């Protein structure tokens, strides 16, 4: 099962009501220096305090935001895919760990 974790050296910042992911130090080798994300994505990012599978992250988000898992699955999938593709998230296979 693949789990996702934030790339070390990437921080979430809030500037004038906008959410930005900023890559510092070595993280810049793997992702753009800065990207803007929406409020929902920022909320999901804050939940990634350790590696989570998509199902685990969806479960945690449902508990925290008091929403149905089925309503969160697609937004979380899109969040994971976009940020993994751009390098801000790292996918780790449990079998490789």
Language-model segments: residues:
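Acidic, low-complexity/disordered tracts enriched in E/D and polar residues
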Residues: 1-46, 91-97
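Long, charge-rich, low-complexity alpha-helical segments
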Residues: 33-97
């Amino acid at each position: 099962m693949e789990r996702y974790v934030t790339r070390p050296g990437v921080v979430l910042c809030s500037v004038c009501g906008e959410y930005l992911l900023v890559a510092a130090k070595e993280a810049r080798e793997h992702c753009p220096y800065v990207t803007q994300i929406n409020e929902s994505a920022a909320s999901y990012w804050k939940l990634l305090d350790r590696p989570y599978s998509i199902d685990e992250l969806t479960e945690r988000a449902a508990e925290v935001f008091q929403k149905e898992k089925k309503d969160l699955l697609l937004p979380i999938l899109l969040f994971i895919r976009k940020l993994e593709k751009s390098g801000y998230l790292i996918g780790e296979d449990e079998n490789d760990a």
